[in-house]
Regions:
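Conserved small/polar residues in nucleotide/adenosyl-binding loops
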Residues: 1-6
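Bacterial lipoprotein signal-peptidase II cleavage site
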Residues: 17-41, 45-49
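Extracytoplasmic "Venus flytrap"
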Residues: 60-61, 65-84
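Secondary-structure end/capping motifs
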Residues: 73, 261-335
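Pocket-flanking alpha-helical
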Residues: 76-82, 102-139, 151-165, 183, ...
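Ligand-binding cleft/hinge of the Venus flytrap
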Residues: 81-97, 182-200, 232-233, 289
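Pocket-lining segment of extracytoplasmic ligand-binding domains
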Residues: 128, 200-292
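Flexible hinge/capping segments at coil-to-helix
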Residues: 157-172, 260-264
Length: 350
C-alpha cells in the first residue's frame, strides 16, 4: 500500500471514530442535561426547605442570644448579684445562648419590648406595668415574684410645707407613669377623696424626677431605692411611703408564645433565679458588697435598705390577692380600660 492510501485509510478510520464519538456525545447530552436539571431542582427544593425552616425560627434561635432586662433600682440585689456572678451566662451558655442585658428600666418600655420580641425575659417589672400591658391585650405572663417592698417606694417634697394629700392640690408631682410609684400616688390621693386631676402629674423617670425636685421645677417627686435614700439623707421631706397604699409587687415576666416555643429556657431562667437567691443567702456580705459597688452606696446604707425587701420568688396566694387589689384599683381609677384576670397572668410552668 502506498503512503497516500495509508493516509487515506487512517483519515477514514479517524472519521469513523469521530463520528461514533459525536454520536455518543449527542446521545449522552440529554441524559447529562436531565441529571443536571434534576440536581438543580433538588438543590432548589432543599434550599427552599432550609429557608422555610429558618423563617419559622424565632429571633432567639437565629441569633443564639437571649435579651434580659437589667434594672438596679430601687434596690434590686438579685439582678446585681446575678450580673456580678454571671449566673445567667453559666445557665444559658451550655444551652448555646449568649445573654444580652437591656437597659430599659421603665415598665411601659419593658412591656413594649417584650411584646415586640426584642426582649425575652423581664427580670424585675412592676405588677402594675404587667396589668396595664395585659389590659391592652399584650401577650405577657408572670413567671415568678421578684420582690415585695412597699416601704421602699416614697413620695418626697422639698420640705414639710407638703404634709398631706390636700397640700398637693394644684402642685406639680413628677414620677414614672404606669408604675408602682404611680399607683402609690393615685392611691394616696384617692384616700383623701382626690384624683390625679387635682394635681399636675409630670411623667418622667426616677433620676429626672429627683433632679426636678432638687432643682425646684416640681413640688414633689416619686422616688425609690438609692435615690430615695440619698434624698432622705439630704433632708428632703417624706410625704408618704407605699405601706398601706400598694404592695409594691415586682415580678419576672415573659410571653406565653415564648414559653410555648421554648419551655426549657423559661425553666432555665427560674433555675437561675433560684441560684441567685441561694448565692445571696450563702454569702450575704458579698451580696451587700456587690450592691454597694453597683449603686454607689455605702455598705451600711445597703444593709439599712436591704431589710425593706422580700425577695422570695414563690408566687403565694397573698401575692395574687395583692395584684387583684391593684388591678381593681387601676380599673376603678381609670388607669386601665379593660379588666384583667390576674390569675390568668400566672404562667403554669410544667
Amino acid at each position: 500500500m502506498c503512503i497516500r492510501d495509508s493516509a487515506a485509510a487512517v483519515l477514514a478510520a479517524v472519521g469513523i471514530l469521530g463520528g461514533c464519538g459525536a454520536k455518543n456525545a449527542e446521545s449522552q447530552a440529554p441524559a447529562e442535561t436531565q441529571a443536571a436539571e434534576q440536581s438543580a431542582q433538588e438543590s432548589s427544593v432543599e434550599e427552599s426547605r432550609e429557608t422555610s425552616a429558618e423563617e419559622s425560627k424565632t429571633e432567639t434561635e437565629k441569633n443564639g442570644t437571649l435579651s434580659v432586662t437589667y434594672v438596679k433600682s430601687p434596690l434590686n440585689v438579685p439582678s446585681i448579684v446575678e450580673l456580678d456572678q454571671e449566673i445567667f451566662a453559666s445557665v444559658f451558655g451550655p444551652m448555646g445562648y449568649d445573654v444580652q442585658y437591656s437597659d430599659l428600666t421603665t415598665g411601659p418600655e419593658q412591656t413594649q419590648a417584650l411584646a415586640s420580641g426584642d426582649i425575652q425575659f423581664l427580670n424585675a417589672v412592676g405588677a402594675t406595668s404587667v396589668i396595664l400591658s395585659a389590659s391592652n391585650d399584650a401577650d405577657i405572663k408572670i413567671m415568678s415574684i421578684y420582690s415585695r417592698s412597699p416601704k421602699a417606694f416614697k413620695l418626697f417634697a422639698k420640705d414639710d410645707s407638703i404634709k398631706t394629700a390636700e397640700d398637693l392640690k394644684g402642685k406639680k408631682v413628677a414620677g414614672p407613669k404606669g408604675t408602682i410609684l404611680h399607683e402609690l400616688l393615685v392611691s394616696y390621693l384617692n384616700n383623701a377623696g382626690m384624683t390625679e386631676d387635682d394635681i399636675e402629674f409630670m411623667a418622667m423617670g426616677i433620676p429626672d424626677a429627683q433632679a426636678a425636685l432638687a432643682g425646684g421645677s416640681v413640688d414633689a417627686a416619686l422616688l425609690a431605692g438609692p435615690t430615695a435614700y440619698n434624698m432622705e439623707k439630704d433632708g428632703f421631706y417624706i410625704v408618704t411611703d407605699g405601706e398601706g397604699l400598694t404592695e409594691a409587687t415586682i415580678v419576672t415576666a415573659t410571653s406565653e408564645k415564648f414559653y410555648e416555643e421554648h419551655p426549657e429556657l423559661v425553666k432555665a431562667f427560674l433555675t437561675a433565679q433560684k441560684q441567685v437567691l441561694d448565692e445571696m443567702d450563702a454569702d450575704h456580705a458579698a451580696a451587700v458588697s456587690a450592691t454597694a459597688k453597683a449603686t454607689g452606696l455605702e455598705e451600711a446604707a445597703v444593709e439599712e435598705m436591704y431589710g425593706l425587701y422580700d425577695f422570695d420568688m414563690e408566687i403565694k396566694e397573698s401575692d395574687i390577692e395583692a395584684m387583684e387589689k391593684t388591678e381593681k384599683f387601676m380599673e376603678d381609677t381609670g388607669m386601665i380600660e379593660n379588666p384583667v384576670d390576674v390569675a390568668s397572668l400566672i404562667l403554669d410552668v410544667e
